[in-house]
Design a protein with these regions (language model features):
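Short, small-residue-biased leader/transition segments that mark boundaries at the very start
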Residues: 2-7
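Conserved helicase motor core of SF1/SF2 NTP-dependent helicases
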Residues: 12-22, 29-290
Length: 290
């Protein structure tokens, strides 16, 4: 309540909130430009550390699809730095390449990812006749993963309704961890999760329950959703589907699509000034980082 009044007074009286010196923002892609403009106005004397992955903005209503506008607003000074962390330590090469090919089906800019050289099993895509066969396949795959010693396994569903249906179907044959992902009660075992609850998490193995063209049409919003689902897997990834497989997987990626990179990638190549001149060291931190 007190902070809300501070922000209100700042906007109303054209003053600056002075009780914060540095702001750290994680999952930065989930906030829209209006939120950043408000922060910049209310906390104009702060320094910022902003981290995120625009490929993981799975909302079609808000958030960022590229860093370009944010850079213009939040990083205008000569001492501001924009960096792209290209190295991925999470996924195997096979999973990373599979997920990156999904991204290329979108119309938005793509930032390059370089997986560490850690190879694993190829990504498996299996067609099922109906829901019953999907459940049978899921049971077999989960038990095979458990026999390999994979401790954390996620069955990723498109939404809550499908997750509830799959949970009910698997409970008789697979021991499930029924912790509430929305409340961050994540532990070892097998979890059946709606896709939106998996963002920010990782599992030894992931089973995408139904990657059909109906659940994941070739549209930007679904590109990012399927990308997020695939990149939750550390070691093994299997994709099931019934009907027709989504074009995000089956459609080939053209050379032109693979050349589509964000303009922000080029911006990173520009030299960044990191040394403060002697005359500037006599200024206060507030003046230097204004």
């Amino acid at each position: 309540r007190q902070r809300q009044m501070c922000i209100r007074d700042s906007i109303k009286e054209d003053t600056v909130i002075r009780e914060t010196g540095h702001v750290v923002i994680d999952e930065a892609q989930d906030f829209g430009m209006m939120a950043y403009a408000s922060l910049k106005y209310c906390l104009s004397k702060c320094t910022y550390t902003i981290m995120g992955d625009v490929a993981q903005n799975i909302s079609d209503r808000y958030g960022l699809n590229d860093w370009t506008e944010l850079r213009k607003l939040m990083l205008p000074g000569e001492f501001d730095y924009f960096g792209i962390l290209q190295k991925s330590y999470r996924n195997t090469v096979e999973i990373s390449e599979f997920a990156t090919d999904i991204l290329y089906h979108g119309s938005f800019p793509v930032y390059p990812v370089e997986p560490i050289i850690r190879h694993g099993e190829p990504v498996t895509v299996k067609k099922c006749v109906d829901f019953t066969e999907q459940v049978t396949q899921a049971e077999q795959i989960i038990k095979a993963w458990q026999s390999k010693g994979l401790d954390t396994i996620a069955v990723v569903c498109i939404d809550e309704a499908e997750a509830e249906k799959v949970t009910a179907a698997l409970q008789g044959s697979v021991e499930l961890n029924t912790g509430d992902a929305g409340k961050w009660e994540i532990g070892e075992g097998v979890m059946v999760l709606p896709l939106k609850y998996t963002k920010g998490l990782e599992f030894d193995a992931v089973l995408i329950f139904n990657a059909s063209e109906e659940d994941y049409p070739v549209e930007d919003g679904y590109v990012k959703q399927l990308y997020v689902a695939a990149t939750r897997a550390l070691h093994e990834l299997t994709v099931l589907y019934r009907g027709k497989l989504t074009g995000l997987i089956v459609d080939p990626v053209s050379p032109e699509q693979k050349q589509r990179m964000s303009l922000a990638v080029d911006a990173q190549k520009k030299p960044v000034k990191t040394v403060v001149k002697q005359a500037e060291t006599e200024k206060t931190k507030e003046e230097i980082y204004r």
